[in-house]
């Protein structure tokens, strides 16, 4: 039985009715049933479905059913994503707008609730409950109110954003809407400070981007190769980066930067300068928050280069400010470690290098930058010349000048300038880094000037550093920069470079330097000595080097002339080898590319097939699950309706109260109905027992009560009668008094009104006199109008009646014509029916006549068949006795150890010695001929009837062409006398063999033996086929040759049979039989398999049959029954050899 489904507009009306009566859940269920129905998906337009969808989402928002809203949105997307994208966009935006409005309302309600709570009691602000709650949970009233009122709506809004993003992530038509919703979700996280949701949102968007980058064959799939898609994704990631920076989620900001760089690298179009500037600015901010001053400065330098090159309207102040920012960030980079920790302790670990390389890729640099390379690039870009005088001096003091005694004082002046200048607010974060770099420069320059220095003196030189910070920097310089520093706390002194056995690395440190350290001098002593000795030798022997060079040049020239031809050939041969190698490699590459292309094409084809198979399986699985879900939903709905129906009754509520929710889910509708019936029966039994006990109790109680109340009733009635009588008397007295008073008042009023009669009569007379003339005039006008209207209506009625009579006359005339036509048509139809009935009766009479003739013919044929069968049985018995007698004498005449002898050459036909041949042969021959004729009549009934007079054709083959005779081989035939006129026995004819036997089996059998249905073949006239059978056809009739008749001892077959054969068929019989054969086919059934006795009869039929020769009667009907009987099973019994 199909489920009842409502039309969408009817469902919307019903939902509105449920909402009006305060049942939003029922309204939502009604709309959800419509959305779950698959029949309406493509049957209605968006004008019908869109209002229903808005109502559906409104109910979902009101009830906070985000999962139900998701189901409806997915259904709506599948329906209209290719038809009307604007409708889908309006629905989704409306849904999110409703969710945001409810969330804002909840926030306002939460704040109002806290305000009311705070203003509740001004005298007792801190209640005991608030104190305990703050001590237990550490939250104030606003947090508790938000968690109770606001948090559910915030969660619902977050789920709505996630559902919409999941809904639109692969739809290219809704791509802009997808990115708008992503920005709305970022704003939501900022507004409500949802950091965990922001992280999940970033992961979700990153997963969506990975899915987009994968190849997709969907019709509505988003392609990352499109420029619009790349730009939208880039804008969304930039918004994500801004939101992450505002929420101080630096890890998410760094991941967003990686995504932005990947999108820019993927895009074939160069990003706009504004985007790149924003990218470098955010990247510098992230590096600054991460404490990576090196890459922060590199990002600012890239931003400066981009702005300087592409921004045409850049003012001098802006350029100066940006240059100062870049210069100060570069100078604030800590001095590089000469021996980093990962080189010293974990030299095999490449992760820091890989991380630096990865960060360099984000900046578009080929290799990680260094402090020296950045300062060199700053100088190349002429940045120190673009900044103000103070910052230019800062660069010179730190990187060019060597003045350790005044270094910190000079830097302090720059620091004061930065702190006091309001326009230098962006430079304030670099002050501490600048101080650390200054202290490190100071220590390095002091180490080149002094071997030792007092701690207090160094503190005076490092004015903006305390003793603890200074000692820490000294230790770090020893640890990271390989400086030789020793602190003597006892003497409160510091010693530099006193150990001559240790030195720095081979490269010199960057920055200004006065001289090398003593340890550096000891390390480079041999190098210096070699340099000085080389210079001395060149001074002592000034021409030696020139002579050596000339000698070496001469040797080189001679060597060249010796090897130039060989080298030339070698180069040519090498070039040829290179070309051959290139050709070989090209061929290999082409073959490899072709093979790879074929492999990829095969893999692609397999992948497509696998994907198609997977999609089909998923479709089948979805259909199966959907079917299961529908069945489950039907069951649940039926169970729910049954439970609701039962819960409306008292016994149902009682029965359901005994079951928990899990128990109800385990039951189906039948089990619940069964339990309900059991509960009803039990309650009925309890009620019957209670009623019986109650009946007995009430009976006793009522009887006792009535006995006791009888005297009380009598007393009460007597008192009541007295009271009623007194009440009636008092009431009647009051009524009489009131009636008398009313009559007196009425009489007085009548007397007063009688005095007004004369005045009334005078006023009426005067009024009638005044209005009499006006009345007469109006009456005349009215009568004139009445007369005119009467005449007009009479004229109209005459015209109308005349027209009605004319129309009635025309209508009657038309009806008369139609009636006559109908009568003519009915008469013609009756004549046709009578003619058809007469033809039908004629046909039935003819059919009945044919059936009677057919039945008569059938009875005659059955009688003939019965007689033939009896003759066959009699002859079979005679032949069986003859064979038994012959078998007894056979062994006497058979040669020893041999088989039957062949026919003697004399042609006498006697192959048994001493046996009476003539009589036996003649008797057997007669019996065989009778069998032959009887069987052949049945076998070839149709053929003999068809041939009729054609049997009198020429037959010159004599007895040798009989269809029973098997010819002897050529050798035996040659030895036999040709003119032996003695009659041969039938057994001898049968046993003559030779090549004719093979002809009979191979050729004759194929041509003439009827092994099955063959009359449907077109073999030409019957006469031609009979002529082809001359090799073994029956030839028992009179011959047309002049050969004398054999003496057969008065055989009855010697009589002429022409008349008999001529009378068997009429002139029309042959035509009718031919028609019968053409219509039904003269198919013969399979021959019965009967064993042929090997006795001396020589006949190949085992079932003899005798017949009476009498002329065939002429029949109007074809002999279908006779032919059918002959064909059905008695046409032959030949045992095939």
From Swiss-Prot:
GO terms for molecular function: mRNA binding; translation initiation factor activity. Residues 319-501 form the PCI domain. The modification Phosphoserine is found at residue 908. It is found in: Cytoplasm. It holds the Pfam family eIF3a_PCI_TPR-like. Residues 588-623, 829-899, 922-971, 985-1046, 1054-1083, 1106-1127 have a biased composition (Basic and acidic residues). Disulfide bonds: none annotated. Gene3D superfamilies: 1.25.40.860, UVR domain. Keywords: Cytoplasm, Initiation factor, Phosphoprotein, Protein biosynthesis, RNA-binding. Its main location: cytoplasm. The keyword Transcription does not apply. It comes from the Eukaryota. One of its GO terms (biological process) is formation of cytoplasmic translation initiation complex. Residues 588-631, 829-1137 are annotated as: Disordered. Component of the eukaryotic translation initiation factor 3 (eIF-3) complex. The eIF-3 complex interacts with pix. HAMAP family: eIF3a (MF_03000). RNA-binding component of the eukaryotic translation initiation factor 3 (eIF-3) complex, which is involved in protein synthesis of a specialized repertoire of mRNAs and, together with other initiation factors, stimulates binding of mRNA and methionyl-tRNAi to the 40S ribosome. The eIF-3 complex specifically targets and initiates translation of a subset of mRNAs involved in cell proliferation. This is Eukaryotic translation initiation factor 3 subunit A. It comes from Drosophila yakuba (Fruit fly).
